């Protein structure tokens, strides 16, 4: 038995200089698991609650000492002596201890830090790499990366309404080559922007945040960068968008306001706007193409694009099986973004991935805009054979930590490692 003998929570800083929660779990054998949790910028209204102190005299009210205290007192008392290899039981213990629907009492940040640290300790105890501990002998597929190379919306101070413009290398036969492709395009784009006298400063997730006049101008420039790097857009590399449409949806009026382009569009018009972009550019994936509360708009978008474009629900589904189940039954979207801190435990995270796959939906494992050096999501992506990962651009070490971990995993897998390429979009025609 891998008995838990000590649990230590602490306040550390994330990639934006904001406090977050880190946890160490020590087992009887002497092995330790350590995990730090991420934090989002654009968040879904139904996400599990991230507990912040609200004390304006510390970190502008963003301290997490209450969450840390919960780890070091209540949570510690509840799981001390339990078997770390019983992940589902441990997570259920945390959920019952919290006792709320949204984890608002103990805080999803406290609960997730413990859940992840327990899994890491148990993997160490078992002598297994984390991805293998999660997925067993069947874990062998590396994910296609969604690389956010241009930031707009809530992730940047520019006139782009769409939050993320991403590239997805798909013609390569290994993750290593896909990563090289992405890096070369990133540097080609930097040169193009510099030559145009545009900003090459990077945003929260490592992408550039220049002041393009329209979404189309941005997409044209990304295609130019792909070609400048020696790749073919639509063949070697596909494009993906994260609209984060909830951020510019005006519920009272029922319109999507693209301020950068001076447009006010109904749900149907915005679906047409996105379809037009997909006709002009090799876009394979659109995340949060409608607002989280606009289910009629989501239905329209799914009927219009759902057979040829991956339509990913992030704010829509918030990694929650109850909401995902409703979406599946209503034919909303065809993919779910998986963010571990939206739901707050690993067991619930894996349940959402499993439900999506059973329904023929894809699952994209994702970082948050406020990240740490913790690379657990890389192991989750391989351990669940998810096929796709979204973990930022080709700069900032908080993003590189995940890519570098995937390189190590691919090396560890050796000849049995596979890279799905276009096969990651198994539900598109």
UniProtKB/Swiss-Prot annotation:
It comes from the Bacteria. Gene3D superfamilies: Enolase-like C-terminal domain (3.20.20.120), Enolase-like, N-terminal domain (3.30.390.10). Belongs to the enolase family. It catalyses: (2R)-2-phosphoglycerate = phosphoenolpyruvate + H2O. Its cofactor is Mg(2+). GO terms for molecular function: magnesium ion binding; phosphopyruvate hydratase activity. GO terms for biological process: glycolytic process. Binds a second Mg(2+) ion via substrate during catalysis. SMART domains: Enolase_C, Enolase_N. The active site is at residues 205, 339. This is Enolase. It is found in: Cytoplasm; Secreted; Cell surface. GO terms for cellular component: cell surface; extracellular region; phosphopyruvate hydratase complex.
